[in-house]
């Protein structure tokens, strides 16, 4: 039976690990309220400060995978992942049978600028005994490429949902079919229409696994059942809390290069407990950022570009949708009567040049448009406030 998660329920099982990892022995004697009142929340700014302090590690005997994230949503964050010794997340992936020796995986993660997910997933999968094939640019895949994938019995797809769908579309255009029995997605939620495409293509028995992750922590939870909106927390690695409707995580082992102590993920979720299993459902980003093709884009990033054309404060609403060809669309609503038709075109062009949006357009995965709309028609909350972001993608 599911019960509402309360931090006090699991505190006694994690406090000694936290005390040891962070060299704070007093924590072993604390109650959970003492912990939450005594240890401050670690925000992005605090993480970045520790990030700067980690540079000396690059001259140590260990090797690291170096990635940079969130370039369009604020300060470029450097993320380090251990490449020597125990490989990150391997024990959990083996325990949950995410990867195994019979897997031949097509890695669909786009090899983007300074992007680490491609190498990270390959590293974890290979450490579990799986075979890895890096796919690269979908736009140049030919029939012989699919024949080569069939020859080596490719049976697993790994990637962001939109990349998985794009790969399927190219495969179908070439009139080829891989015998895929497992699909592993990360980077964003799997939408209902995407799940339907995967099932219709590879059959109802295909196993779909979601990885809930962030660049600072790596993989935090897996969705293993039919409901890919319900995630099982990796309780051997993380202690989770709720703070002002946000999720906080604390590392329980030293696999994170920068251990996290009450780190604010910025996401919200419902948390429940079933035996020793902690489940996360209805995971949502905060309402001033959105996930577009696996990238987190801040509302303020869009606003800053609009203000170049009109410095005064105006209401801007962002609508997210899916086109008939399954490409994702960002539609930026601006008030009528402020911009000339020429300015609208220039604004649309500059917004499209935001790196992650531009890349999605170049890869034919998504695009952006600007529409003039009377603010009276803007979508509002039940309290009558104009919403920053309206997500109609599912």
Placement of each model-derived feature along the sequence:
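Active-site glycine/GP-rich loop and adjacent strand/helix microenvironment
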Residues: 2-13, 134-394
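Nucleotide 5′-phosphate-binding alpha/beta core
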Residues: 1-96, 100-102, 331-333, 337-394
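Active-site phosphate/ATP/adenylate-binding loop shared across adenylate-forming ligases
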Residues: 47-176, 182, 186, 191-197, ...
């Amino acid at each position: 039976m599911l019960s509402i998660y309360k931090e006090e329920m699991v505190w006694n099982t994690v406090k000694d690990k936290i005390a040891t990892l962070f060299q704070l022995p007093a924590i072993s004697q604390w109650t959970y309220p003492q912990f939450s009142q005594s240890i401050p929340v670690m925000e992005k700014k605090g993480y970045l400060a520790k990030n700067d302090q980690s540079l000396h590690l690059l001259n140590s005997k260990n090797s690291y995978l170096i990635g940079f994230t969130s370039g369009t949503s604020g300060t470029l964050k450097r993320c380090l992942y251990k490449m020597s010794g125990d490989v990150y997340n391997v024990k959990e992936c083996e325990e949950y049978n995410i990867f195994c020796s019979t897997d031949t995986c097509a890695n669909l993660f786009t090899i983007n600028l300074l992007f680490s997910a491609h190498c990270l997933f390959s590293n974890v999968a290979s450490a579990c005994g799986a075979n890895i094939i890096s796919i690269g640019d979908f736009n140049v895949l030919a029939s012989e490429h699919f024949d080569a994938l069939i020859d080596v019995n490719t049976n697993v797809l790994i990637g962001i949902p939109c990349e998985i769908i794009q790969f399927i579309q190219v495969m179908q255009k070439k009139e080829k079919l891989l015998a895929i029995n497992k699909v592993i997605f990360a980077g964003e939620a799997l939408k209902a229409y995407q799940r339907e495409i995967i099932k219709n293509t590879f059959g109802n028995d295909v196993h779909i696994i979601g990885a809930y992750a962030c660049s600072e922590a790596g993989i935090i939870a897996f969705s293993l059942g039919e409901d890919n909106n319900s995630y099982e927390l990796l309780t051997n690695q993380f202690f989770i809390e709720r703070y002002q409707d946000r999720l906080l995580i604390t590392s329980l082992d030293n696999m994170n290069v920068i251990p996290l102590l009450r780190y604010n993920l910025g996401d919200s979720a419902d948390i429940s407990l079933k035996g020793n299993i902690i489940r996360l459902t209805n995971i949502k980003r905060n309402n001033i950022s959105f996930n577009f093709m696996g990238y987190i884009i801040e509302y303020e990033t869009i606003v800053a570009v609009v203000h170049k054309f009109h410095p005064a404060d105006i209401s801007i609403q962002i609508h997210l949708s899916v086109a008939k060809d399954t490409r994702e669309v960002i539609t930026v609503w601006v008030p009528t009567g402020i911009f000339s038709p020429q300015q609208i075109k220039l604004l649309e062009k500059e917004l499209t040049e935001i790196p992650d949006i531009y890349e999605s357009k170049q890869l034919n995965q998504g695009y952006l448009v600007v529409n003039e709309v009377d603010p009276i028609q803007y979508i509002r909350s039940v309290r009558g406030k104009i919403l920053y972001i309206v997500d109609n993608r599912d």
